[in-house]
């Protein structure tokens, strides 16, 4: 018994034939499967066609695009095809990242996305802390804080009221 070549069509149970080379399923009798006056004779069954050629992380770049092919003396063939263009949302995100402000350290050329992170980094070069001279500290454990709200949250741990008692 000879095995069918991958280019031959495989007949399905429900009157559909599968073309493995193109990755499409064709319907023989589409009269009962019409929806809202649109007949779709060919449909890409899954992303398996793309999966054979691309790594898993690359598959996410594919999007479904409708394709219509004119035929001689019949209805046009309409099917969905996986296109490899990136999604517009992805492009917007890349442009947003490109226009974002960056802050660079003059000493080591490291780059940060916020000025606060750059200040903390520069303090490491100097060997000094970034705590202000009038920093807030916990009267119980002497832990220091740069913001009053952080001290208040910490004081709950010791069950201290706002006055420090």
Swiss-Prot record:
Keywords: Metal-binding, Repeat, Zinc, Zinc-finger. A zinc finger (C2H2-type) spans 103-125, 136-158. SMART domains: ZnF_C2H2 (SM00355). InterPro entries: Znf_C2H2_sf (IPR036236), Znf_C2H2_type (IPR013087). One of its GO terms (molecular function) is zinc ion binding. Residues 1-38 are annotated as: Disordered. Gene3D superfamilies: Classic Zinc Finger (3.30.160.60). Residues 1-10, 19-32 have a biased composition (Basic and acidic residues). Coiled coil: none annotated. This is Zinc finger C2H2 protein ECU11_0990. It comes from Encephalitozoon cuniculi (strain GB-M1) (Microsporidian parasite).
